[in-house]
Swiss-Prot record:
Subunit structure: Homodimer.
Residues reported to bind NAD(+): 10-33
GO annotations of cellular component type: cytosol
Keyword Manganese on entry: no
Protein name: Alcohol dehydrogenase
Active site: Y151 (proton acceptor)
Domain of life: Eukaryota
Gene: Adh
UniProt family annotation: Belongs to the short-chain dehydrogenases/reductases (SDR) family.
Gene3D superfamilies, per database record: NAD(P)-binding Rossmann-like Domain
EC number: 1.1.1.1
Molecular function GO terms recorded: alcohol dehydrogenase (NAD+) activity
Record-linked Pfam families: adh_short (PF00106)
Amino acid sequence: MSLTNKNVVFVAGLGGIGLDTSRELVKRDLKNLVILDRIDNPAAIAELKAVNPKVTVTFYPYDVTVPVAETTKLLKTIFAQIKTIDVLINGAGILDDHQIERTIAVNYTGLVNTTTAILDFWDKRKGGPGGIICNIGSVTGFNAIYQVPVYSGSKAAVVNFTSSLAKLAPITGVTAYTVNPGITKTTLVHKFNSWLDVEPRVAEKLLEHPTQTSQQCAENFVKAIELNKNGAIWKLDLGTLEPITWTKHWDSGI
């Protein structure tokens, strides 16, 4: 899929991986890049505009933990402004297993709520045009970092939820896939807390393993968006992009 003249809404598009991905996106000659983030960063927005002045870059403050109704209201404003949204990227995430409720609220519930809100506009059963959802998971959604089971569990939930969305595409008209970064050099992994402090040195130990830069991750992130494969589970690790084949152990039969 060519991203030229597309309208993309990026939740958490100013974070570590997010900002580098936003830089790559504007190079693709989007029509609009709408960034929803909790904290404004005028310098980063100005930089993105300078990378490609042809792209309209807009920022709206957004906390993914707000009720669905508030998200729907914000999306209504965005649709009124740019008329169509082609791609939604759900990228909000925290890594701190001391904050159990907030980890689940940001990493999973917020993603589900944002998705639910945009279906109000996209669902073909309501006369919507359909759309594309790219959800950011993590390799911990495949195999946990067991010292951070809350974070890992939230990312496993993202993979499962997104796979369900993909299978619902014939009904809703909305396709979906996950991008799942491996250990990436961002502030997220420099210092974080393990669950019940089972491993106080978890961040230090994790960074002893091979990593990738946020730029490497961003480049593959945008490649995955351009490939636009419904139901794909992409692994973005060590500077590579690889599709994951999920093993089926059970089928509901419905």
